[in-house]
Amino acid sequence: MSLAYNIPQYSASEASYTGNITEWSWKYGPGDTENTYAFTYDKLSRLTDTKQYVNGAVSDLFVEKNLSYDRNGNIRTLNRTETGELFHAFSYGYTGNQLTTLSDGAADYAYAYDRNGNMTNDGMNGLKVVYNRLNLIEKV
């Protein structure tokens, strides 16, 4: 596995001198196909798109596109494609900076928090979390 910052291998990535990762490459094992994700950011260093390469050729297996953000920098939308077709169209809702709703186009999921700001309900994964007096997870 390797990460590229300043000198990306693929032209879809621009060199970044901000510390942003421009490419992530990996192989599942020796002699396996090289997979690479190339990342694109906006002027505020927020991820806007990804592109996938397999053995140097552009692939559209799994790609994130059209990320948008609110004024606080929270993700508002994210589209995920699989083999070129829209697979998930996520929309995120917040109260302040706490995620309260997530919609994937098929269903809406609710998130809840206790008065200390700890997430107590993850609607998408069906998790309920209980915290102790020290704000440490006690039960999931």
Residue ranges and their predicted role:
Residues M1-V140:
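Acidic/glycine-rich beta-solenoid
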